[in-house]
């Protein structure tokens, strides 16, 4: 494994700052007659959303890989290359790339290409996949879920070091002294590991010295403090420079708390109960939603003031360096998402900075 430099795009930002990003899976909306929105239209609207996020000064924009009818993004790097040509400053990444069902060499090559097009703004988030449609689609056995990720992460780490690769494993043919192109121009590819909350995943990320992002979609974010502490302790134990700790949670910003909740709730409920039916969860309702919107809950829904206070509380409770809002949730309309993005940059971000400076 190649060590990170102490400075760089994923170095910790300090106790009085937090970076704000956005991510989306390209949730498929509804047309006026209730039929699903065409996937192509969703992708074109995503480009408008990325442009706006850049224009209002947000730090990062990520798109998550899925292979199902309710999400439009199946090839994050293709979208990110298009977004790179239409943005100037914002970092562009996946959220996440399902490494287990992909080729680590091709993942690196695609992101190094995006990095070149964007002049050094690419990053990749790697995950095992909480959705598993890619495994049968690409011919992988779910029984190999663990070994696929472990071996492919090991290979990716070697490729990322930009030296000749020597690797052997069970999941693909061996490599002996081969080089991978194109290399990155300015730095190693910023590489995150997305985790759902198991100590094993946290320790694996720390072993590689990669920054970590926790997907917090329920309960109370402060409950992740032991895992954040475990990560920091393990990074130090492995002798790596400290890296950023981030979280990802769903949410929506509108001018008032009432407007944000009433606008967001029906779309959140559709998504929550659709996924819940697939995963054996019980049905959700308004009480669960309101609890998640409370100050200690995992939904960042409300006015700019409310959302900013929740993000500042997250910073104090977990010491995170970055917060990514999953701003698309179910069939939430494009116009509502655009307003939410604008408010995140123009109202939430300055309020968070004010709260953390005080």
Could you tell me what each predicted segment is?
Residues 1-87, 91, 189:
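N-terminal beta1-alpha1-beta2 module of alpha/beta enzyme domains
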Residues 28-43, 97-105, 187-197, 295-304:
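Active-site mouth loops of central-metabolism enzymes
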Residues 20, 53, 57, 65, ...:
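Conserved, mostly hydrophobic/aromatic
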Residues 2-18, 32, 103-210, 222-225, ...:
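Internal, glycine-rich beta/alpha segment that forms the wall or movable "lid"
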Residues 14, 54-55, 80-88, 111, ...:
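Acidic (Asp/Glu)-rich catalytic clusters
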Residues 40-52, 196-203, 306-313:
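Short, acidic/polar
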Residues 20-24, 61-63, 92-94, 122-126, ...:
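Hydrophobic faces of well-ordered beta-strands that scaffold small-molecule active sites
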Residues 2-16, 22, 146-179, 221-321, ...:
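An alpha-helical appendage that flanks or caps ligand/catalytic pockets
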């Amino acid at each position: 494994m190649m060590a990170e430099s102490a400075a760089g795009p994923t170095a910790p930002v300090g106790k009085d700052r937090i970076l704000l990003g956005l991510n989306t899976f390209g949730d498929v909306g509804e047309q006026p007659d209730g039929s699903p929105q065409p996937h192509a239209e969703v992708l074109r609207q995503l480009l408008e959303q990325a442009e706006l996020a850049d224009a209002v000064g947000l730090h990062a924009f990520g798109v998550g890989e899925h292979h199902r009818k309710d999400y439009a993004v199946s090839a994050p790097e293709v979208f990110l290359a298009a977004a790179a040509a239409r943005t100037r400053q914002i970092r562009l990444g996946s959220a996440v790339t399902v490494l287990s069902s992909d080729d680590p060499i091709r993942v690196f090559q695609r992101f190094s290409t995006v990095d070149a097009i964007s002049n050094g703004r690419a990053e990749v988030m790697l995950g095992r996949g909480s959705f598993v449609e890619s495994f049968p689609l690409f011919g992988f056995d779910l029984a190999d879920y663990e070994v696929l990720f472990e071996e492919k992460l090991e290979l990716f780490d070697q490729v990322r070091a930009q030296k000749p690769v020597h690797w052997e494993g069970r999941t693909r043919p061996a490599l002996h002294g081969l080089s991978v192109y194109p290399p990155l121009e300015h730095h190693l590819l910023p590489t995150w590991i997305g985790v759902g909350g198991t100590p094993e995943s946290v320790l694996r990320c720390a072993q590689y010295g990669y920054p970590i992002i926790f997907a917090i979609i329920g309960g109370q974010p402060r409950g992740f403090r032991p895992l954040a502490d475990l990560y920091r302790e393990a990074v130090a134990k492995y002798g790596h420079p400290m890296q950023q700790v981030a979280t990802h949670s769903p949410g929506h910003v509108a001018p008032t708390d009432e407007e944000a909740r009433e606008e967001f709730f029906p779309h959140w409920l559709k998504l929550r109960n659709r996924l819940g039916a697939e995963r054996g969860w019980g049905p959700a309702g308004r009480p669960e939603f309101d609890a998640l919107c409370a100050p200690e809950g995992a939904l960042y829904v409300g006015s700019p003031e409310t959302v900013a206070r929740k993000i500042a509380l997250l910073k104090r409770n977990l010491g995170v360096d970055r917060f990514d809002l999953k701003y698309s949730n179910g069939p939430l309309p494009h116009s509502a998402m655009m307003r939410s993005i604008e408010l995140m940059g123009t109202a939430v971000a300055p309020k968070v900075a004010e709260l953390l400076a005080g």
